Amino acid sequence: MAPAEILNGREISAQIRARLKNQVTQLKEQVPGFTPGLAILLVGNRDDSNLYINVKLKAAEEIGIKATHIKLPRTTTESEVIKYITSLNEDSTVHGFLVQLPLDSENSINTEEVINAIAPEKDVDGLTSISAGKLARGDLNDCFIPCTPKGCLELIKETGVPIAGRHAVVVGRSKIVGAPMHDLLLWNNATVTTCHSKTANLDEEVNKGDILVVATGRPEMVKGEWIKPGAIVIDCGINYVPDDKKPNGRKVVGDVAYDEAKERASFITPVPGGVGPMTVAMLMQSTVESAKRFLEKFKPGKWMIQYNNLNLKTPDPSDIDISRSCKPKPIGKLAREIGLLSEEVELYGETKAKVLLSALERLKHRPDGKYVVVTGITPTPLGEGKSTTTVGLVQALGAHLYQNVFACVRQPSQGPTFGIKGGAAGGGYSQVIPMEEFNLHLTGDIHAFTAANNLVAAAIDARIFHELTQTDKALFNRLVPSVNGVRKFSDIQIRRLKRLGIEKTDPTTLTDEEINRFARLDIDPETITWQRVLDTNDRFLRKITIGQAPTEKGHTRTAQFDISVASEIMAALALTTSLEDMRERLGKMVVASSKKGEPVSAEDLGVSGALTVLMKDAIKPNLMQTLEGTPVFVHAGPFANIAHGNSSIIADRIALKLVGPEGFVVTEAGFGADIGMEKFFNIKCRYSGLCPHVVVLVATVRALKMHGGGPTVTAGLPLPKAYIEENLELVEKGFSNLKKQIENARMFGIPVVVAVNAFKTDTEAELDLISRLSREHGAFDAVKCTHWAEGGNGALALAQAVQRAAQAPSSFQLLYDLKLPVEDKIRIIAQKIYGADDIELLPEAQHKAEVYTKQGFGNLPVCMAKTHLSLSHNPEQKGVPTGFILPIRDIRASVGAGFLYPLVGTMSTMPGLPTRPCFYDIDLDPETQQVNGLF
């Protein structure tokens, strides 16, 4: 018969590499910034191992795979190797890796333990027990196949001879080649015989094979006469034998006597140049396949998420009973369901986690989802259910309409939790769970704000004290101490010198005048705006005297405590867009003025770097879930009066990327639309650059009755009779407030959906009236909602209306230009949003407007600090007040956060405890550790 056709592994592997190169190019085009990653871990420094690795690195480079060669010394222990493997398992830029064998270490290392530490989804060498088990079971699409057997199969397929029904003989049973080759041929429908060192009559067994794969490691063991005529022969051997004709005195031969075998076989692989090049090509193919699987798993699209079914009961159980009736899914599972990588999530137990900002970097090329803001009409003191509506809406969009959806809400302060308000995490069957975690410490963010804020406060008073009690020289020497005879400025001090126009870096070269300017902030105590904070309601800290200890040498001053969430640091964090931006904002925070009227910042105090360290974890959003299993970001909780009252930009941005272009992110703005929504647009959206798609405006029958002239509503007291009996006239009269808030929302060019939050005392006629009037006066739609009693199903109509509204044309626009004078910006808000005739700047406010403009802060947006109980400055005026002049008694600056806040009336920044605080009902069961009485 004619000599066998040569299966040239070099040529075939070159074709495979060319195909892989094209695939990698396409992947990079489809996903900008993405590159398949391969890592090769070497223990020791064997020459042969380095040679093999270099071949793989070169192949990866040609294809476009980012390959990394990790070298560990011979002193490496088994635990150190496994630790490194664990880090590669969690590295999302590495899609496949292998451990080069043998392990060359002076320590005893269990190779099996090391190999099995590799995550199966990254086991591109196919050597883990899981990969072997799946191959043995025939799960070829759910495992990686060892590269040499995989290459052998490709060579066999290259012949064009069908494998199915053929008798295949595999000589050798190693874990790397022989055993997996048997399984691979078996699941390609061959009848397979495996031979080994104990096989009797090996020549007879070999002679039965239509397909023969030899991997024994013994030179030319299989003779040509053993081979069945016309067989396909795949020789995996690489052996060195003496040859005087070769310059190095040896030659390479396979496990088959090639010259004899090629006279009987129909196809045969040469050695070298047969199987060897295919092994490397298959490693590259598996790496590209792993990268594709990674992209498939984390590509934009519908989440594979498991929702929780609610067990609705009547009469309605308490909020806490409802919360505890639904077991949250493990938060790590939820994180995976929504497309977060393990290294992007820091678990805080089973029900809460922090999400790293690296997720935003990874997803930066993904289009954003639809952005929805939930706001409300001017509320009663009881609140109208914005948080409950936010949760109900996302449950409807996710668990019922199967959309990717995220809620982004503020973190509540602990002060009101133990004071008059009680817990807050939505309500009824629309809650964030577990509510105990939501309302208490969560992940410690507010404690971090408190520590950072009070560090600034301590720095202010300490600096005043030291400047009052030391000479310029002594002060300078302590600020720039001599270490081993050398004085050196810190980085933050060099930045201060540059701001002062002193272009020097050597402390010894400063003049006396420069030392004075550098060392003295010369803070005017009367101008200090920075207060200490505490996350507890404590009325007796509203005004205090500090510095009364003898050690302070009589340097006392009057000060106060605010509640922690009133801190500018909280507002700054919520408007931060990155870690670098947060560092800059913290440095810009103005805490006082000097006696010359110059602003003194946290950067001047030298404390901004330390603040960033304290806040490095607080910048990461907190991941929780709703009762029905949809994801929630809980992050930041600034006041809605002296601050902007919105959750963080960072949480919104990460959520918008995670949901993808067809998904929804629903966030809530504090208080009514005239306050929280206006600040959401003019401050938060201005800084984030995000454009909202829909406004959801929450209204209730009881609130409209109040605005229509109903009796006073008081928290803690039963509702008057007018609120629980049908009164269409009162509802229609009070609709004026809802109409005005619809107009306010539409002023920004965004479609408005009115959510009529229904209570059991409301009648259908009242609810229908509100919906009809809303549509007649500009709302895109208005729907009745029963999500408190029914969960997501009760907000289904609302969710569908939001979907339609998100597709409607919109033209988002801000209300004012930042370049306008401060007074004009205030006037625009007062007239257009509140309906005032004009504003009146009282002397202190006029003075502050001039000072801040002179200091360079006049171009900041305006954050109005006004009562939330009326469109006017008078909380007793309901409906739509007219003919009033809005008095501005003062203007203050949150320069780090990035806004000026005019004060309309008096704002309390430290709540007090009532006669009977909520803490009377709160306790812990010592046996179950269950929190009772929180709400």
UniProtKB/Swiss-Prot annotation:
EC number(s)? 1.5.1.5, 3.5.4.9, 6.3.4.3
Region Methylenetetrahydrofolate dehydrogenase and methenyltetrahydrofolate cyclohydrolase (D/C) domain, residue ranges: 2-291
* Coiled-coil intervals: none
Residues given in the record as substrate binding sites: Y52, I53, N54, V55, K56, V99, Q100, L101, P272, G273, G274, V275, G276
Please state the pathway this protein functions in, per its UniProt record: One-carbon metabolism; tetrahydrofolate interconversion
Q: Where is this region: Formyltetrahydrofolate synthetase domain?
A: 310-935
Keyword Plastid on this protein? Answer: no
Q: Which InterPro entries match?
A: Aminoacid_DH-like_N_sf (IPR046346), Formate_THF_ligase (IPR000559), Formate_THF_ligase_CS (IPR020628), NAD(P)-bd_dom_sf (IPR036291), P-loop_NTPase (IPR027417), THF_DH/CycHdrlase (IPR000672), THF_DH/CycHdrlase_cat_dom (IPR020630), THF_DH/CycHdrlase_CS (IPR020867)
Cross-referenced Gene3D superfamilies: 1.10.8.770, Formyltetrahydrofolate synthetase, domain 3, Leucine Dehydrogenase, chain A, domain 1, NAD(P)-binding Rossmann-like Domain, P-loop containing nucleotide triphosphate hydrolases
List of residues binding NADP(+): G172, R173, S174, S197
Task: Output one GO BP term.
Answer: L-histidine biosynthetic process
Q: Where in the cell does this protein reside?
A: Cytoplasm
Q: Where does ATP bind?
A: T380, P381, L382, G383, E384, G385, K386, S387
What SUPFAM superfamilies does the record tag this protein with? Answer: Aminoacid dehydrogenase-like, N-terminal domain, NAD(P)-binding Rossmann-fold domains, P-loop containing nucleoside triphosphate hydrolases
Q: Name one GO molecular function term.
A: methenyltetrahydrofolate cyclohydrolase activity
- Where N-acetylmethionine occurs along the chain? M1
Q: Name one GO cellular component term.
A: cytosol
Residues bearing PTM Phosphoserine? S318, S413, S490
- The active-site annotation reads K56
Protein role: Trifunctional enzyme that catalyzes the interconversion of three forms of one-carbon-substituted tetrahydrofolate: (6R)-5,10-methylene-5,6,7,8-tetrahydrofolate, 5,10-methenyltetrahydrofolate and (6S)-10-formyltetrahydrofolate. These derivatives of tetrahydrofolate are differentially required in nucleotide and amino acid biosynthesis, (6S)-10-formyltetrahydrofolate being required for purine biosynthesis while (6R)-5,10-methylene-5,6,7,8-tetrahydrofolate is used for serine and methionine biosynthesis for instance.
Q: Which family does it belong to?
A: In the N-terminal section; belongs to the tetrahydrofolate dehydrogenase/cyclohydrolase family. In the C-terminal section; belongs to the formate--tetrahydrofolate ligase family.
How is the quaternary structure described? Homodimer.
Domain-level remarks: The N-terminal methylenetetrahydrofolate dehydrogenase and methenyltetrahydrofolate cyclohydrolase (D/C) domain carries both the methylenetetrahydrofolate dehydrogenase and methenyltetrahydrofolate cyclohydrolase activities. The larger C-terminal formyltetrahydrofolate synthetase domain carries a third formyltetrahydrofolate synthetase activity.
Report what the protein is called. Answer: C-1-tetrahydrofolate synthase, cytoplasmic
Q: Organism source for this protein?
A: Pongo abelii (Sumatran orangutan)
Could you tell me the gene encoding this protein? MTHFD1
